[in-house]
Curated annotation (Swiss-Prot):
Its EC number is 3.4.21.53. GO terms for molecular function: ATP binding; ATP hydrolysis activity; ATP-dependent peptidase activity; sequence-specific DNA binding; serine-type endopeptidase activity. This is Lon protease. Residues 1-40 are annotated as: Disordered. The keyword Ion transport does not apply.
């Protein structure tokens, strides 16, 4: 039930019309009886917003339901009075409240008029007459109650008259500040003679924004002096609030007026300057800027034609139009492209080699390729664009190599990542028809570098995505094709851009997820992980000095013992790259910096030099993160050690086999350890091959008769896949069958066929590094990988005994020398 000013009476409900007719008839009957005798029993209608006060005329919306039924009951009786009482809680449901949820004091009201509304509800015009108090509830269904009426004391004292004058004075002040009810107030004040202070108090508080609880308190106050005193307090609060609101409005209007005045003055000043020739209009400024730009560039004719057309178009547009902004932005991009500007290349091999060696340790094959690139550029009087893809684990220096290449060639460097990119518009730009459209990353690279032959690094190309917006990998096909990228077309510019002189460097962790057509356009250079000796050199020559400089320290403040760095590498940073190692070095230096500052504040200079040793390293880094890579110092029966290769570098892979009685009575094999489909097939091949060649390796031995063999690959939470564990699985099964342990410190890798041939695999360098880390000094590699092994540096192969095999017979002789 809500009060409202809506008087729309269209689409009248027939039942409501009938109620109105009956009420008119009952009104006539009631007037004939006694207009001055109020009924002692009233139907009560709950209110939940604000209470009404005597002397008011107010509309009330009656919704379909029990309250509408009350109207019908009143229409059938000789009475047209109802009671209006406020609920105790504002959020109470007025259709479902009981007497215990209502205040005891309310008002009686006479129904003057009903205006039916579509949907079974009606708007009722009420005349509020007297205060009432609920004496005794009669029924709960329609909230009918026995009520008593409060009669006002008509005695007018001098004090009440003074109160009335104060109230009228405040109301007049309110009129000046808030003219919303000006007409109604003037009518009321014109008829007010101060002889009815109670009515004046009720009317005045009804005008305020007081809370429902404050208004209900006024309604329940029957003593005239107390009521008019409380009304005066509420009016003064309302006056203070209106003054504050008026002050805020005046400040806002003053600010707006000042801003408008400044705007008009600036516009007048601008117009005067233009008339005097002291200032140019926006058209002239923009056109002059664009002319100045492309006059400094060697713009191709096809681009010049587009620029000229757009400049002619810009002159015809109003500066305030949306099309002007679109055209200006388009010209801004067209003229900011460094047409014909190329940086001068340097082809000094000695200087290039010096820079590469200074920035990076090892990576000889990568450095060799860069020097070849420089040599070709020197002989050909200019270097055409190349596409190089650096593949390797995280933290091995792929991004920093890209920066070094740009430094060696004296070119600008721009890097962006396509990891997770799903919209081809990021590469080729958005159409100009879209709001906020802009060119793709490649044109942005040209803008930022301001040359047409920068080094652009496209990072994480193996993690590129696709969606309904397009396939960014397919968009890169045109970019990375030397035969096509000379005419690269960005969707936003819609003008051909020559990218043939750009040197593209891409980085990836693995090649498996890169589409073959894209992979075919790249020259792949692999960066393997680092061994202990390499990490030690990198930490000593690069990471520690750089971190010390960042922390504001020097070699006089802190030094690392080589054994401490080795301990850190083996126990805290056992990864393919050096990113975690670098973070650990910085962590140590931060703690050292804290101690130095604390000592300085305590004036203790004697402990300003710190040496990091294996013994005190744990004080800085906490407990070691890694234990030994080896699960077994001495290999038990049924266990063979393989070598694996992942996107994070090389790792050891243990294959464990155990034999249990079979419930089916047949020989059976079961594989666990998050093995992928290819590895599952390798286990089946190993099982079948061993079964077929059993007499060769274990003559007279039954093949796991009435047993189930369980093969497990530890670290079961890590997914594993690939064919290179074939010979390792056969060796594990043979060890279990013969009850003979595999040769200790032996690691192996190789794909097995059903006939026992051992095929080549990938990641020889990574697997060799993993073997050195796990202290496996006897290795078995396929014969097909001998050439890969021979190309490795001597320090990697030092101390290792490597056997190359073509058939599993060779593996058997090495793994089980005593059989």
């Amino acid at each position: 039930m809500n009060s409202t000013n809506n008087t729309d009476s269209q689409n009248l409900d027939p039942n409501a019309s009938e109620v109105e007719k009956l009420l008119d008839e009952s009104a006539e009957a009631e007037e004939k009886v006694d207009d001055h005798t109020p009924p002692s029993e009233l139907f009560i209608l709950p209110l939940n917003k604000r209470p009404f006060f005597p002397g008011m005329a107010a509309p009330l919306l009656i919704e379909a339901g029990p309250h509408y039924e009350v109207l019908t009951l009143l229409a059938k009786s000789s009475q047209k009075h109802i009671g209006l009482v406020l609920t105790k809680k504002e959020d109470a449901n007025t259709l479902k409240v009981g007497f215990n949820q209502l205040h005891r004091v309310g008002v009686s009201a006479r129904i003057l008029r009903i205006m039916p509304i579509e949907g079974g509800s009606a708007q009722v015009l009420l005349s509020i007459e007297d205060r009432i108090r609920i004496v005794k509830p009669i029924q709960d269904k329609y909230l009918k109650a026995k009520v008593s009426y409060h009669k006002e004391n008509k005695e007018l004292t001098e004090e009440l008259k003074a109160y009335s004058i104060s109230i009228v004075s405040i109301i007049k002040d309110l009129l000046k500040l808030n003219p919303l009810f000006k007409e109604e107030l003037q009518i009321f004040l014109g008829h007010s003679d101060f002889t009815e202070p109670g009515k004046l108090a009720d009317f005045s508080v009804a005008l305020t924004t007081a809370t429902r609880e404050e208004l209900q308190e006024i309604l329940e106050t029957t003593d005239m002096h107390d009521r008019i005193d409380k009304a005066l307090v509420l009016l003064k609060k309302e006056l203070d609030l209106s003054r504050l609101q008026s002050s805020i409005n005046q400040k806002i209007e003053a600010t707006i007026t000042k801003s408008q005045k400044e705007f008009f003055l600036k516009e007048q000043l601008k117009t005067i300057k233009k008339e005097l020739g002291l200032e140019k209009d926006d058209h002239a400024v923009d056109l002059e800027k664009f002319m100045e730009r492309f006059n400094k560039r060697d713009v191709p004719q096809y681009a010049m034609d587009v620029i000229q057309d757009e400049m002619d178009k810009l002159q015809t547009l109003e500066t305030s139009s949306a099309e002007y902004a679109v055209c200006r932005n388009y010209l801004d991009w067209l003229t900011i492209v460094p047409w014909g500007i190329q940086t001068k290349e340097y082809h000094d091999l000695k200087k290039a080699e010096s820079i590469l060696n200074k920035d990076h340790y090892g990576l000889e094959d990568i450095k060799q390729r860069i020097l070849e690139l420089i040599s070709v550029g020197k002989l050909a009087n200019g270097m055409k664009g190349s596409i190089i893809c650096l593949v390797g684990p995280p933290g091995v220096g792929k991004t920093s190599i890209g920066r070094s290449i740009a430094k060696v060639l004296h070119r600008k460097f721009f890097r962006f990542s396509v990891g997770g990119m799903r919209d081809e518009a990021e590469i080729k730009g958005h159409r100009r028809t879209y709001i906020g459209a802009m060119p793709g990353k490649l044109v942005q690279a040209l803008k930022q570098s301001q040359i047409m032959n920068p080094v652009i690094m496209i990072d994480e190309v193996d993690k590129i995505g696709s969606s309904y917006h397009g396939d960014p990998a397919s968009a890169l096909l045109e970019v990375l094709d030397p035969e096509q990228n000379k005419d690269f077309l960005d969707h936003y510019l819609d003008v051909r851009v020559d990218l043939s002189n750009v040197l593209f460097i891409l980085t990836a962790n693995v090649l498996d997820s890169i589409p073959d057509p894209l992979l075919d356009r790249m020259e792949v250079l692999r960066l393997s992980g680092y061994i202990l000796e390499e990490k030690l050199q990198i930490a000593t020559k690069y990471l520690v000095p750089r971190a010390r400089k960042e922390m504001g320290l020097s070699a006089q403040n802190v030094t690392f013992q080589p054994e401490a760095l080795k301990h850190m590498i083996n126990n805290y940073a056992r990864e393919a790259g050096v990113r975690t190692l670098n973070e650990n070095i910085k962590k140590v230096l931060r703690k050292v910096a804290l101690k130095i500052v604390q000592n300085q504040e305590k004036n203790l200079s004697k402990k300003s030099r710190f040496t990091i040793t294996p013994k005190n390293l744990q004080d800085y880094l906490g407990k070691p993160v890694f234990s030994s890579d080896r699960f077994y110092e001495k290999t038990p029966v049924g266990v063979a050690t393989g070598l694996a290769w992942t996107s994070l570098g090389g790792a050891t892979l243990y294959i464990e086999s155990v034999q249990v009685p079979s419930s089916s009575g047949k020989a059976d094999m079961h594989l666990t350890g998050q093995a992928g489909d290819v590895m599952k097939e390798s286990s089946q091949i190993a099982w079948t091959y061993l079964h077929s060649a059993l007499e060769r390796y274990a003559p007279g031995q039954p093949f796991f008769e009435k047993s189930q063999v369980h093969i497990h690959i530890p670290e079961g939470a890590t997914p594993k896949d690939g064919p290179s564990a074939g010979i390792t699985m056969v060796t594990s099964l043979l060890s279990l069958l013969l009850d003979v342990p595999v040769l200790n410190n032996l690691g192996m890798t190789g794909e097995l066929t059903l006939t026992g041939r051992v095929l080549g695999i990938g990641g020889i360098r990574e697997k060799l590094i993993a073997a050195r880390r796990s202290k496996l000094n006897i290795l078995i590699f396929p014969e097909d990988n001998r050439r890969d092994y021979d190309e490795l540096p001597a320090y990697l192969k030092k101390g290792l005994k490597v056997h190359f095999v073509t058939h599993y017979d060779d593996v058997f002789k090495i793994a089980f020398p005593g059989v």
